[in-house]
Amino acid sequence: MTGKKRSASSSRWLQEHFSDKYVQQAQKKGLRSRAWFKLDEIQQSDKLFKPGMTVVDLGAAPGGWSQYVVTQIGGKGRIIACDLLPMDPIVGVDFLQGDFRDELVMKALLERVGDSKVQVVMSDMAPNMSGTPAVDIPRAMYLVELALEMCRDVLAPGGSFVVKVFQGEGFDEYLREIRSLFTKVKIRKPDSSRARSREVYIVATGRK
């Protein structure tokens, strides 16, 4: 992509971003990101979070989902969060900065979970997008497979999993894999998710 084309594309993205009603609402409410609204819509539909829960948040920065979940699980709840990027502290959130694909980071995350019974694993992870689906989709699928592996390791029976997935090659196989592990699986496209985006959210409940 030439610099001129990239500049035009970036300008369009910025214009769309700042005119987005959810971005504007997030700024007014002092929220960390518009992702807060996506999780709020999912919670209204699926009632994933309850007071006192332990939750794992993958791809947490800048903290929109953790910020939302804190309001749902209360002071006795606990969030263990991880992201490659830094995140400003949130009371009630134990944050680990590191690459979730790195075995040492995964080990450190599991150590922080310890013997806790995790009721929800949530992942809003996404790779740096190149704009080429043949490159981006496999990278994204690798991340969501790792998130599902985390579910296998830490999620308590009856627990829930919410994960952002980009529709494309590997999506149907991944959905089948999730259905084999959970009793109820739904696909959500929140209103606050941009219509042109390939992203959807798989909401799986009732870990077998």
Swiss-Prot record:
It is found in: Cytoplasm. The active site is at 164 (proton acceptor). Keywords: Cytoplasm, Methyltransferase, rRNA processing, S-adenosyl-L-methionine, Transferase. GO terms for cellular component: cytoplasm. It comes from the Bacteria. S-adenosyl-L-methionine binds at residues 63, 65, 83, 99, 124. It is an enzyme of class 2 (transferase). It catalyses: uridine(2552) in 23S rRNA + S-adenosyl-L-methionine = 2'-O-methyluridine(2552) in 23S rRNA + S-adenosyl-L-homocysteine + H(+). Pfam families: FtsJ. Its main location: cytoplasm. GO terms for molecular function: rRNA (uridine-2'-O-)-methyltransferase activity. The keyword S-adenosyl-L-methionine applies. SUPFAM superfamilies: S-adenosyl-L-methionine-dependent methyltransferases (SSF53335). Its EC number is 2.1.1.166. Specifically methylates the uridine in position 2552 of 23S rRNA at the 2'-O position of the ribose in the fully assembled 50S ribosomal subunit. Belongs to the class I-like SAM-binding methyltransferase superfamily. RNA methyltransferase RlmE family. HAMAP family: RNA_methyltr_E. This is Ribosomal RNA large subunit methyltransferase E. The gene is rlmE.
